[in-house]
Amino acid sequence: RILPAVGRNDRQIDTSSLAEDTLTTFKTQLGGRKVVFEPYAVVHAEEPQRIRDLWKQRLRWARGNVQVTSRYRHVFFRPSRVHKLGKPSFGIFWFSILLLPVAMILSSVGLVGLFLLHSELAAVVFRAMWITAACTYVYTIALAVQLDGRTGLRSWREAILFPGLISIVVMITAFFPGLLEKQVPALFGVTLGPQFEAGWTLFVYIWISLAMVGAWIAKLVEGTWIGRFLTPFLIYLVGYGPLLCAVTMDSYVKELQRADAVWDKTEKIGRVIG
């Protein structure tokens, strides 16, 4: 009863957006129906085996979310008695994901600006930002493992390395200032000069944006002879999170260019794991 009611021509799901599932959810709630989240639902979904296929899949979803945002821009942050899509909490949650790449770039620009102005506020903002990111990361991983322990045990390496090895190092730097650039070298009788310290500081300030560039390079070289080894290495360095943010950034570009909204599906292999 619900799908025909929210579909097109009263017969099918509305596929005018590349994120037809999100669009259906929005139309369901806007029609006064309640959408209930079922955390233990079993889903048989095909996972892309290559980065470029994952990029293609997620780009379609990301572009669809941008389209949904544009179509229902009048709904966000406008509370209603009919639905909950206008609640401020939902709007903050929605745009914190949709605009995350923009926030990452702006944070890097702001931190570098404060650093060049020799402001002590740069270190405070850096630590607050990355400690918050670390706590969110730990909470998300713990919640995911709790909801699906079997998959969590099978993919524990990917879960731990979701933010990337370098980002984990940056998190350690935020929690323990001076540990990696002063205390650890001192154990080996090495003293790093002020130039290294300044360079390291700049690196950790811009890394949150640089990681997206690294993810794009990993996708770019995957089809080359060196990509067989370099792409997995880069993904573990930069992380799956920055990869998804890079895809979201690509979705901005594609929508601004008014690229063709086609269902560019990935190759199906039909392999069952687990």
Q: Where are the regions that the model predicts?
A:
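Juxtamembrane C-terminal module of membrane proteins
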Residues: 74-84, 123-274
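Non-transmembrane catalytic domains and loops of membrane-associated enzymes and transporters
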Residues: 1-114, 270-274
